């Protein structure tokens, strides 16, 4: 059973900041960040503005945080 880290956690580690610092920068509560990082909450179902604020705080794109492999959409 491999440990699956959320893209949010990987992006935060890459940015070199704590959950608290990400919370301060983004205005998203630490508890929410923790739940998203531990995959207790699905970031794909988060409000767009929350994902946007997290991405801005981490200096990355929203696509970097969303789990796009889980989203299936038809090309057409």
Regions found by a protein language model. Give the residues of each.
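A short, Lys/Arg-rich alpha-helix, primarily the initiator
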Residues: 1-14
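Conserved hydrophobic/aromatic packing and binding residues within compact polymer-binding modules
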Residues: 8, 22-23, 33-36, 65
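The alpha-helix within a helix-turn-helix
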Residues: 12, 23, 55
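Short, basic-rich loop-to-helix N-cap that marks the start of a DNA-contacting helix
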Residues: 16, 40-56
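Short coil turns linking two alpha-helices in DNA-binding domains
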Residues: 18, 29-32, 47, 61
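Recognition helix of helix-turn-helix/homeodomain-like DNA-binding domains
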Residues: 27-44
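Short, charged recognition helix plus adjacent turn
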Residues: 44, 56, 64-76
């Amino acid at each position: 059973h491999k440990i699956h880290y959320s893209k949010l956690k990987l992006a935060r580690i890459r940015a070199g900041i704590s959950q608290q610092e990400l919370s301060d920068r983004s205005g998203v509560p630490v508890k929410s960040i923790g739940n998203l990082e531990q995959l207790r909450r699905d970031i794909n179902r988060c409000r767009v503005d929350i994902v946007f604020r997290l991405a801005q705080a981490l200096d990355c794109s929203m696509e970097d945080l969303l789990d796009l492999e889980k989203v299936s959409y038809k090309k057409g």
